[in-house]
From Swiss-Prot:
Species whose genome carries this gene: Trypanosoma brucei brucei
Name recorded for this polypeptide: Large ribosomal subunit protein eL30
Entry's family note: Belongs to the eukaryotic ribosomal protein eL30 family.
Pfam families per UniProt: Ribosomal_L7Ae (PF01248)
GO molecular function per UniProt: RNA binding; structural constituent of ribosome
The keyword Ribonucleoprotein belongs to this UniProt entry's keyword annotation: yes
Keywords from the UniProt entry: Ribonucleoprotein, Ribosomal protein
Amino acid sequence: MAKKVKSKVDTINTKIQLVMKSGKYVLGTQQSLKTLRQGRSKLVVISANCPPIRKAEIEYYCTLSKTPIHHYSGNNLDLGTACGRHFRACVLSITDVGDSDITSA
Protein backbone atom coordinates (compact mmCIF):
# COMPACT_ATOMS: atom_id res chain seq x y z
CA MET A 1 0.00 0.00 0.00
CA ALA A 2 1.30 3.45 -0.90
CA LYS A 3 2.40 5.87 1.77
CA LYS A 4 -0.05 8.65 2.43
CA VAL A 5 1.61 12.01 1.87
CA LYS A 6 0.25 14.93 3.87
CA SER A 7 -0.11 18.17 2.03
CA LYS A 8 1.37 21.37 3.41
CA VAL A 9 -2.12 22.69 4.20
CA ASP A 10 -2.91 19.63 6.33
CA THR A 11 0.30 19.97 8.33
CA ILE A 12 -0.19 23.68 8.99
CA ASN A 13 -3.81 23.01 9.99
CA THR A 14 -2.74 20.38 12.53
CA LYS A 15 -0.09 22.74 13.91
CA ILE A 16 -2.67 25.53 14.22
CA GLN A 17 -5.05 23.17 16.02
CA LEU A 18 -2.26 22.20 18.44
CA VAL A 19 -1.61 25.89 19.15
CA MET A 20 -5.33 26.36 19.83
CA LYS A 21 -5.21 23.59 22.45
CA SER A 22 -1.87 24.23 24.15
CA GLY A 23 -0.74 27.76 23.29
CA LYS A 24 -1.94 31.35 23.38
CA TYR A 25 -3.23 33.22 20.36
CA VAL A 26 -5.21 36.23 19.22
CA LEU A 27 -7.66 36.32 16.32
CA GLY A 28 -8.45 39.45 14.34
CA THR A 29 -6.63 42.32 12.72
CA GLN A 30 -6.86 44.91 15.48
CA GLN A 31 -5.84 42.55 18.28
CA SER A 32 -3.00 41.16 16.17
CA LEU A 33 -1.71 44.67 15.49
CA LYS A 34 -1.84 45.34 19.22
CA THR A 35 0.29 42.26 20.01
CA LEU A 36 2.72 43.20 17.23
CA ARG A 37 3.15 46.72 18.62
CA GLN A 38 3.75 45.29 22.09
CA GLY A 39 6.28 42.79 20.74
CA ARG A 40 4.47 39.75 22.14
CA SER A 41 3.71 38.01 18.86
CA LYS A 42 5.85 35.00 17.83
CA LEU A 43 4.19 34.29 14.47
CA VAL A 44 1.48 35.92 12.35
CA VAL A 45 -0.71 33.91 9.97
CA ILE A 46 -2.51 35.87 7.23
CA SER A 47 -5.26 34.37 5.05
CA ALA A 48 -5.04 34.51 1.26
CA ASN A 49 -8.02 36.83 0.79
CA CYS A 50 -7.08 39.37 3.46
CA PRO A 51 -7.64 42.92 2.13
CA PRO A 52 -4.41 44.38 0.68
CA ILE A 53 -4.38 47.46 2.92
CA ARG A 54 -4.63 45.32 6.07
CA LYS A 55 -2.07 42.86 4.74
CA ALA A 56 0.38 45.69 4.03
CA GLU A 57 -0.12 47.18 7.49
CA ILE A 58 0.42 43.84 9.23
CA GLU A 59 3.50 43.07 7.12
CA TYR A 60 4.89 46.51 7.98
CA TYR A 61 4.52 45.93 11.72
CA CYS A 62 5.94 42.40 11.35
CA THR A 63 9.09 43.77 9.74
CA LEU A 64 9.43 46.37 12.50
CA SER A 65 9.09 43.77 15.26
CA LYS A 66 11.00 41.07 13.29
CA THR A 67 8.08 38.66 13.57
CA PRO A 68 7.81 35.86 10.98
CA ILE A 69 4.76 35.84 8.70
CA HIS A 70 3.03 32.79 7.26
CA HIS A 71 0.73 33.38 4.29
CA TYR A 72 -2.06 30.83 4.70
CA SER A 73 -3.09 29.36 1.37
CA GLY A 74 -6.80 29.15 2.24
CA ASN A 75 -9.30 31.96 2.56
CA ASN A 76 -10.41 33.57 5.82
CA LEU A 77 -13.21 31.05 6.34
CA ASP A 78 -10.70 28.19 6.07
CA LEU A 79 -8.40 29.89 8.58
CA GLY A 80 -11.30 30.38 11.00
CA THR A 81 -12.28 26.73 10.61
CA ALA A 82 -8.67 25.61 11.19
CA CYS A 83 -8.76 27.62 14.42
CA GLY A 84 -11.89 25.74 15.49
CA ARG A 85 -14.18 28.73 15.10
CA HIS A 86 -17.35 29.08 13.07
CA PHE A 87 -16.52 32.52 11.72
CA ARG A 88 -14.00 34.15 9.40
CA ALA A 89 -10.53 35.15 10.57
CA CYS A 90 -8.15 37.13 8.35
CA VAL A 91 -5.28 37.26 10.82
CA LEU A 92 -4.04 34.93 13.55
CA SER A 93 -1.32 36.12 15.91
CA ILE A 94 0.38 33.45 18.01
CA THR A 95 1.83 34.75 21.27
CA ASP A 96 2.78 31.39 22.83
CA VAL A 97 3.29 28.30 20.65
CA GLY A 98 2.71 25.79 23.46
CA ASP A 99 3.49 22.21 22.38
CA SER A 100 3.41 23.01 18.66
CA ASP A 101 6.44 23.54 16.41
CA ILE A 102 4.61 25.93 14.12
CA THR A 103 7.40 28.53 14.13
CA SER A 104 9.70 26.09 12.33
CA ALA A 105 7.15 25.62 9.49
